[in-house]
Structure formats: C-alpha cells, structure tokens
Amino acid sequence: MNNLLIFLLLALIISPNYGGRNQNEFEEPDQSQHSHDSLHLRQRDHIHRTLRYDRPNPATHNQILEQLVDVYQRTIQPLEDAYHYNDLPERNDLSVGQIKANPLVLFLGPWSTGKTTMLNYILDTDILRTGAEPTTSEFTIVSYDEKKKSTEGVVLVSDKSKGLDALEKYGQNFLERFTGVGLPHPLLRRVTFLDTPGIIENRKQQERGYPFNKVVKWFIDRAQLILIVFDPTKLDVGLELETLFKQLKGKESQIRLILNKADSIATQELMRVYGALFWSLAPLINVTEPPRVYTGSFWPYEYKFNSNSALFKQEEASLLQDLNDVIENRLENKIALVRQHATRVRIHALLVDEYLGKLNKQWTFLDNQENVIDKLLQSPSEFNIFKGVQTKNNISPFDLPSPSVYRDFFSNNHMTDFKPLSQHCGYFSSCLMDQLDEAISTKLPALLAQANKQKHFSESRDEL
C-alpha cells in the first residue's frame, strides 16, 4: 500500500503550479507550435527521448544472440529431444525463434479501458482500431515491418522464425482471432507488443470458441512486461479477472497496473478509485510488494483536469522508463530465460532416468512389467523417486514438478522407450548431461557477463 500513501500525499500538495523533480523533462508547448495547440495534442518528444527510437543495437548484440542459440542447439536441445521434454503437459517450451525474438510487452485488462489507444499513443499511430464499445476481439501482435501490413494468424504460426508456431495447437477458431500488424516504426526493431481482447465479466470463455485462458497464459509465460489497464470509471473485478491473476502467479515482478483515463475524474474521486482498486485486487495478489501502479491518461490529447498534469507526466515518464529497461535488458533476460529452461530440461531428464532406474530394479522376469510401471507412477513416493532426484542432484523441492505430471507424460510415452542417461554418452564426445551441466554452470554465465560488459560500454558511450 506504499504506492497509495505516496499518491495521497502528492494529490494533497499538487497545484496547477506544481513543479516536481522531473518538471524540466516535459516542457509545455510553445505558442508558435500551432499544429499541436490547435488539435490540443500533447508534446511527445519525451517518448522518443526515453525509448531512444533510433538507437541501433550494438555490433556485438547479434553475435551474443547467435552464441546463445548455439548453446541451446548443441547442449540443451539434444536432451529435450532424447527425453521428449515437449511432451510434458505442463512446461514452457522454447525455440530458436523465441530466443531471437524481440522482448514482448503484453496489454491485458477489461474491455474499453484504453489498451489499444495506449499502444497507438506509444507508437504515434492510429492504425489499431479503438472505440467506446469492445473493439478488439483479436489477439494482435504488433512488430516491425518495412511497410504497413496485416498478416493472418495462419501465416504467423507457419513461420517458425517468429517463434509463434506453438500457437497452432489452440485450433483454427483461435487462429481466425489472431492477427499481426507490421509497422515501419524504429521502436519495433527492438520490442514487440501484443494487444488482447478485453475481458468481459459476463461472457463465458466457451462463447469465444477457443481456449482463451490457455492462449493468454501462453503469452504471459513469454512476456517481459505485462501491462494490466483499468478504467477508473468502471472498476469491475469479477471471476474473469480473478482467473487472469491466477495465471499471473510467479510473474508479479513483470506486472504493471495502469489506472488509465485518470484525467476524466476529479482528484478526490481518483483517490477513492485508487484505494478501491487495491482493495479489490488485494486478495488476488499474494506478494509482499504489490505491483507498481501508474496513474495517468495514456493518449495523445491534453489532460482534462490540469491540477494533476504534473503527476500524470511523471507517472508516464516512469512507465516509459520501465519499458526502456525491458528493451535495454533484453539480452540479459534472454540468457536468463535459456538458463531457466535448461534447468527444467535437466530436472526432467533426471526424473525420467530415475524412473527407469527404479523400473530396472523392481522388475523381474516373473513380474508383469506394466504392473510395475503402474505402481511406480501411482506411488512414486514409495520408491523415493522424486526424493532421490532431489537429494542426489541438490535440487530444491520447489523446482520439482508434481508426480501427476509424469503420470500424464508416461501415458503418452512408454517408459521403456527411453534410455538411461548413462547411455547418452559418445565414444568421442562427452555425455549429454555433462554438456548441459557445463552450459548451466559455465557457458551461459559467461554469455551473461559478456552481455553486461556490452551494456555498460554502450551506457558509457551514451554519457559522452
């Protein structure tokens, strides 16, 4: 609730002449700028300045990215394939396309809260359709292209280089509600945005004709920044929004709450709405530090109530800085993502190997093999399968999946189809597990150090 206390204090001291710490960062339009004044548009130079549209990637950026892909293909993917990691019912898959893809910024929230308008504002475009009624019925991915173009979902998932091919599993009805928009905007060379259908509390998921929540979860798992946008005039926290926040568990550090259209209500009402928002969301966000809330009006026009304009400008500057941090840290985040994925693949391979070891130990020619397998799957604790993997490999119990995951996994992959880890060793090459361990402990940390060095060099050059 620290954010609320700070906001209340600011609201009490703000006046039309208020000048905050970042006051000079936003200058009022000069009287000579007739084009802005006549249309009542706000200046947007601060967006360009904060996000550094035209700043090219450092020369070493692509080199580090290619090295990361090489580590994945040589040391992680072989174990993925050997133990059918992608057949796990609960997993975060990874592909070369996803590694090379720009960081993803995801817009979520109830209908008509200004998600699409906010995206249009950041990109200085009106190509994405907006309106008072629900207008976004599609998942729209906005990325760079040499010219303005629209791409159907079927085409998007067929191009593996985009890292979206896994979405094909959600069916034709979803693909008809999935579209891509390409724009020749320099910011899109460095980041990709996803606009989503607004949540309507009285609409059942089944009416959409595709697994909406599963699709949202797929994008949540791959997003580096998640903006959840609210309208202060209609806070509606119901079952649909509750489901969304359940899907966001574990991603709290990437969530930003946006109280949009804040200039449409007076200061006292805004204070009440701010408190009501936290009160409504408190049961859904079980973390010590609540997500940051940004209050403002994220569209190109002048604020309606000028008394809070300085606060809104500072809030917008902070949000833009958050977005810029995601862009600037994209290499470090990619390396961390691949290392996390490698750890999951390692745990999976160790568990399959442990199941195989117990099967070979328990099964004799006098036993029915299927009965032994069933016993292992139904009562893994009796054979210390998960406990054995945990203690022998120094793995946290919180990193181990549920035994039910492996009941599902082995129902589609017969246990005897796999070889023990000891048999995945070459005569002239090291074992697959040894290669993976080296990637986790040595190669990926070395790449991270290289990326940090590149980042510090770029920042030092910018200061000159």
Give, region by region, the residue ranges found by the protein language model.
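Context-dependent free N-terminus signature
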Residues: 1-2, 303
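Cleavable N-terminal signal peptides of Sec/SRP-targeted secreted and luminal proteins
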Residues: 2-17
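Short, flexible boundary segments at extreme N-termini or domain junctions of P-loop NTPases and their
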Residues: 16-106, 456-464
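Switch- and interface-adjacent substructures of P-loop NTPase systems
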Residues: 53-56, 60-61, 66-98, 111, ...
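Conserved lysine of the Walker
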Residues: 115
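Conserved beta-strand segments of the P-loop GTPase G domain that flank and frequently precede/overlap
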Residues: 228-232, 257-261, 296
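C-terminal end of P-loop GTPase domains and the immediately downstream helical coupling element
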Residues: 263, 268-445, 451
